[in-house]
Swiss-Prot record:
This is tRNA uridine(34) hydroxylase. Pfam families: Rhodanese, UPF0176_N. Residues 125-222 form the Rhodanese domain. The lineage of its organism: Bacteria, Pseudomonadati, Pseudomonadota, Alphaproteobacteria, Rickettsiales. Gene3D superfamilies: 3.30.70.100, Rhodanese-like domain.
Amino acid sequence: MEKFTLVTFYHFVQLENYEDMRDELLSCCIEKGLKGTVLLALEGINGSVAGHDGEIRDFLDFVRRDERLRGLEWKESYTNFQPFQEMKVRLKKEIVALGCAELENMEICETGEYVEPEDWSSLIAREDVKTIDTRNLYETKLGRFKYSIDPETINFRDFQEWVRKWIEKDNVSMEQKIAMYCTGGVRCEKSTAYMKRIGFKNVYQLKGGIINYFLKTKNKDGAWVGDCFVFDDRVAVNVDLEPIQLKCLECSCVVNTDDLKNIPRGRVLCSGCGQNTTRFS
């Protein structure tokens, strides 16, 4: 059976020539038969790429030849099918779009304190800690950590508005201990930096995100409930990082990532049933 290695990575660093990097990076990926998506912006690089193991190693070596990216770290998982349809390298304003102008240079922004996966469950179980899931509704409906607050955002850009309303509604103190998590860690870099920027003093983030938590702990403490949405053709994985099959609640056909992202309120519906639900609601 054919086996594919999937790597996810991000690195915040000023890439003044990021537009010039695109063609060379895309050519490298195509030459090595890789598929996935890489985002390039002035603030850094963010990507998920899959292929045969040797070619993935060559790709990572190629990326890290750039001295600005030598500190690039990545997470690996494995699958018996290619989880991407094509190879794309895109130029963006941000590698993860929070839309906060004050965070344009992440290299000089103060982010949340990293918490190792092995220490995460004990942190979020504390009564003096508020845990926030920074992902979107279509993701959180599939699974999340116990004790966590679900902002029910449709888009990551909505997160700032939710925070402002949450502070006002619950009269949240800037001394409140805040623990935050996302799928792979990159959204927490931005969201924890935002929380620090507006005045929160005790902000923590799960190092490497949910995927790293699965890799390192296998959820042995049972802090995670459900499955984890991923942005590729696996759609969702369990705590062993094995793909699961999600079926439409109405017609039982297998749903894909676009179905889930486009259905309101995070229900597991195919696009056809989702359109009918929207039309008659």
